[in-house]
C-alpha cells in the first residue's frame, strides 16, 4: 500500500510542476519583448548575434552556396535589409546599412 501512495504522490508532483512551468512560460512570453527599437536609426535590434550574409544549412534564407542568412523568428543583429513574404530574407551586415537602405532615393518616374 505504501508504494502505491508514493507513486500517486510522485505523479501529482509531476503534474503540478508541468502545469506551473507552462503557466510561468506563458506569463514570461507575454511580458518579455526581445525586440527593441533602436533610437538612432529606427531599426529593430534584438541584441543577439547572427550569421549575416553567410549561407549555411539549418538557417532560414540560407543554404549551401546561396547566401542569404535571413531569419524567420529571431530577428537580425543590425536589422533587416531585405524583407520577404515570410519575414526577413537578408540581414544587414553593419548597423548603418539598414538606414542606408531607408534613405536611398528611388525615383518613380
UniProtKB/Swiss-Prot annotation:
GO terms for cellular component: extracellular region. Keywords: Cell wall, Cell wall biogenesis/degradation, Pathogenesis-related protein, Plant defense, Secreted, Signal. One of its GO terms (biological process) is defense response. InterPro entries: GRP (IPR010800). Induction: By tobacco mosaic virus infection and by salicylic acid. It is found in: Secreted, Cell wall. Residues 1-26 form the signal peptide. Its main location: secreted. Pfam families: GRP. Belongs to the GRP family. This is Glycine-rich protein. It comes from Nicotiana tabacum (Common tobacco). The lineage of its organism: Eukaryota, Viridiplantae, Streptophyta, Embryophyta, Tracheophyta. The gene is GRP.
Amino acid at each position: 500500500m505504501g508504494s502505491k501512495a508514493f507513486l500517486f504522490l510522485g505523479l501529482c508532483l509531476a503534474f503540478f510542476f508541468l502545469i506551473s512551468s507552462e503557466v510561468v512560460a506563458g506569463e514570461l512570453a507575454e511580458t518579455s519583448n526581445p525586440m527593441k527599437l533602436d533610437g538612432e536609426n529606427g531599426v529593430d535590434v534584438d541584441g543577439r548575434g547572427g550569421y549575416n550574409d553567410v549561407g549555411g544549412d539549418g538557417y532560414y534564407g540560407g543554404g549551401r552556396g546561396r547566401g542569404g542568412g535571413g531569419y524567420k523568428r529571431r530577428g537580425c543583429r543590425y536589422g533587416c535589409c531585405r524583407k520577404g513574404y515570410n519575414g526577413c530574407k537578408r540581414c544587414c551586415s553593419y548597423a548603418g546599412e539598414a538606414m542606408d537602405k531607408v534613405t536611398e532615393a528611388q525615383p518613380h518616374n
